[in-house]
From Swiss-Prot:
Molecular function terms, GO-annotated: antioxidant activity; nitric-oxide synthase activity; prenyltransferase activity
Inactivation phenotype: Cranial vascular hemorrhages and pericardial edema, leading to complete cardiac and vascular organ failure by 72 hpf. Defects are due to increased oxidative stress.
Gene: ubiad1
One Pfam family here: UbiA
Protein EC: 2.5.1.-, 2.5.1.39
Family: Belongs to the UbiA prenyltransferase family.
Topology relative to the membrane: Multi-pass membrane protein
Region feature (Disordered): 1-22
Taxonomic path: Eukaryota, Metazoa, Chordata, Craniata, Vertebrata
UniProt name for this protein: UbiA prenyltransferase domain-containing protein 1
Coiled-coil zones: none
Keywords: Endoplasmic reticulum, Golgi apparatus, Membrane, Menaquinone biosynthesis, Mitochondrion, Prenyltransferase, Transferase, Transmembrane, Transmembrane helix, Ubiquinone biosynthesis
Species assigned in the record: Danio rerio
Length: 336
């Protein structure tokens, strides 16, 4: 036995040497590397989930709508501008979601049954969320700077729209916390409707116009339905946390009425556009069968999955709306 130990340690070609020195150590290293890879993978997944990617349709469809309107006016769209604009809006939206996560947790609003449990379940630390949000806001500002060099839009107009949206995304729960004083619905109606559509349109055409504000109305109403259903679902926990939302002020019955208006008024507007101007505006009506089950669930107060389902409806309606505008014959759309 005394003679076999040195042979094994010296890495001889014998069985003991191979198993002792060339198998055990690499296995240990591979195991450690595997654990690090799994930790990194779970960390990245946590960051992605913290962004609430299912809500991104609310920011992507307005960008597509604004670009489609620019296409009908100018006859072409700069795809690079479209891409950079979409990334800029997504970065601000994601950062706003992180701000919302941080302040909801710090104010004791999020709990074990909340839709977003990133901080409640200690998946991420509060400082991680803050740092990630700051990185996204900074990256968004870089995209806005790039848009200034790529687009012919005046700097003051670009800054006004972009930083208006950025400020709204932060002040929704950060700072004065508009969400907590029943003003969150106003922020969503303005930011994820007229402002985002105008931004996408302006960077393409190089000037500000009232036209995108009008065309944004159907999409803005449907997007607000996502937030309203979310606030109605969280009504009891929000009351306990001491915050005030529009859903709390209205109560379940009036909240149901408002949800129906937000859900079905856009379809009425599409009917008017389709009958008076061009039949391509009837395309969003294809999503109408998806709206009736949502109305029934809201009426029965089965709120659990309504925000996510409304977001899915919002995405499809927005896409059909964009296609309807693109397919409209030249000169058939109202130009005010």
């Amino acid at each position: 036995m005394q003679e076999m130990k040195p042979a094994a340690l010296s890495g001889s070609n014998g069985l003991n040497g191979a198993s002792g020195s060339s198998v055990r150590v690499p296995c240990s290293r591979l195991s450690r590397a595997g654990r690090m890879a799994l930790d990194l993978q779970s960390k990245c997944a946590a960051y992605v989930l913290a962004l609430r990617p299912w809500s991104f349709s609310a920011s992507l469809t307005p960008v597509a709508l604004g670009s489609a309107l620019a296409y009908k006016l100018e006859g072409s769209v700069d795809l690079l501008l479209l891409l950079v604009c979409a990334v800029a809006v997504l970065l601000v939206h994601g950062a706003g979601n992180l701000v919302n996560t941080y302040y909801d947790f710090s104010k004791g609003i999020d709990h074990k049954k909340s839709d977003d449990r990133t901080l409640v379940d200690q998946i991420l630390k509060p400082q991680d969320v803050v740092m990630f949000g700051a990185v996204l806001y900074s990256a968004g500002c870089l995209c806005a700077t790039l848009l200034y060099f790529l687009s012919s839009l005046k700097l003051e107009h670009l800054a006004l729209i972009y930083f208006g949206g950025l400020s709204s995304s932060f002040l929704y729960t950060g700072g004065i916390g508009l969400k907590y004083v029943a003003l969150g619905d106003v922020v969503i109606l303005i930011t994820f409707g007229p402002l985002a559509v105008m931004f996408a349109h302006a960077v393409q055409v190089g000037y500000l116009s009232v036209l995108p504000l009008v065309y944004a109305v159907p999409l803005a109403l449907n997007t607000e339905a996502i937030l309203h259903s979310n606030n109605t679902r969280d009504m009891d926990s929000d009351k306990q946390a001491g915050i005030v939302t529009l859903a709390i002020l209205l109560g379940p019955t009036l909240s149901y009425v408002i949800y129906n208006l937000l859900l079905f008024v856009p379809y009425l507007l599409f009917c008017i556009l389709a009958t008076r101007y061009t039949i391509s505006m009837a395309l969003p009506l294809l999503t109408l069968p998806m709206a009736f089950p949502l109305e029934r669930q809201f009426r029965c107060r089965c709120y659990a999955k309504i925000p996510q389902k409304t977001a899915k409806l919002n995405l499809l309606m927005g896409l059909f709306y964009v296609f309807g505008i693109i397919l409209a014959p030249q000169g058939s759309l109202p130009l005010l």
